[in-house]
Amino acid sequence: MVSASNTKHVAHVDSAGGGQVWVDGDILYIGHMRPPSGTTLVDISDPRNPRKITTIPVPPGWHSHKVRAQNGLMIINHERFGQEGPTEFGGGLAIYDTTDPANPRQISKWLTGGKGVHRYDFDGRYAYISPTAEGFVGNIVMILDLIDPENPVEVGRWWIPGQNVGGGEVYPWDNYVSPRCHHPLRMGDRLYVSYWHHGMFILDISDMSRPRAI
């Protein structure tokens, strides 16, 4: 959309409320905020008559409020939402084959430990995620290679000095506000990263194995 002028309301999708909406081809993807609603796929080939085709639920205590899709591949986050719910579900990033949108098929899941993944960017191959990770305070930056979506591979990570307490770093903030990566966004060889109360960082990712603040 180049301009919002003359925009007309042509249809409405009654859903459980969304944390993110994404469109790929004729499919609209809705990531819901609250369980048990997880991710809904809607056929919008006729924009005046959108048709829900399936919903992927999540158990109590978890949500999947973010979704991205490209070329028959959908990725959704799994993140703790509240205190009650099965711990074995696990936080992370779930990867689906959606070549048949009516029957999404989970092909893998990247488990992060802790609360899971909050937000992310996806360019069709690499996912730039904000997960919790063992040994770290808060959420960090992580880059996953999904060229083989059944076997995601971590290729790089970055964090604010002090987050890696498991590696011997000293957590220096006395206000106890955890440094949490909120959302990495890629533009060329740069990753623009919001970090909640700790500001924003620009990372050089020309070498994805060694993200570097600039």
Question: What is the meaning of each model-derived region?
Answer:
Residues 1-214:
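Feature marking well-ordered beta-strand scaffolds used for ligand recognition
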